[in-house]
UniProtKB/Swiss-Prot annotation:
Gene encoding the protein: TATDN3
Protein name (record): Putative deoxyribonuclease TATDN3
Residues the entry annotates as binding Zn(2+) 1: 12, 14, 107, 217
Keywords assigned by UniProt, alphabetized: Hydrolase, Metal-binding, Nuclease, Nucleus, Zinc
GO cellular component entries: nucleus
Taxonomic source organism: Bos taurus (Bovine)
Cofactor (UniProt): Mn(2+); Ca(2+); Mg(2+); Zn(2+)
Amino acid sequence: MGAVGVGLVDCHCHLSAPDFDHDLDDVLKKAKEANVMALVVVAEHSGEFEKIMQLSQRYNGFVLPCLGVHPVQGVSPEDQRSVTLKDLDVALPIIENYKDQLLAIGEVGLDFSPRFAGTDEQKEEQRQVLIRQVQLAKRLNLPLNVHSRSAGRPTISLLNEQGADKVLLHAFDGRPSVAMEGVKAGYFFSIPPSIIRSGQQKLVKQLPLTSICLETDSPALGPEKQVRNEPRNISISAEYIAQVKGVSVEEVIEVTTQNALKLFPKLQRLLPK
């Protein structure tokens, strides 16, 4: 498409990851060349909040910040553990400090993978951390950028019970029938480039295009396993969705960008007038 027409929005990526420390300028240049108009950058733990805010200032109007506490904490794989309310207590004052600059609260959610949430106590604490962040998002009138690995139904139920309305479920791994409960509630689902090699292809078939957004989850969930993903690969998601839905890539880009604008109202201000 080049620079003509509507740009793409990467609704969920991790640009503060160390994987991008050495060449972020180049990565963002390639994203712009691939017609990406906005990058929604999410946090996982309070230790990266300042870095994300600095990136959003450095690439103002292109990198849009979300702050939140992920259900899995710990920077390196061997340190990873289920979130606690203490993790949230450290994060909340920083989120409050930046509340006016945020696009959304995220990445938040539930992760019931057995290695992180093997006990009912851990699951319950994850729920409490999520409930408090849903309440925070409602108070600040911000959308939620949500993780739900191995916890599709519990996550959608909790969001519903708490009255969350603007919700993005990223890289949803639950059953399509569970996803449809989210569609009924008005939630959006973002599809990463790994869709071309994942078991979630039925999900794309069943979700209406009006409920789909695009994401990369960079540096994870790329088209090839073990290869660093980056925002320019978002076109792979768009092409795959177009193929499954039997529509043009242009239509997928147009509809998913409109969906992103509905979901993240602050994006409107960034559009060229």
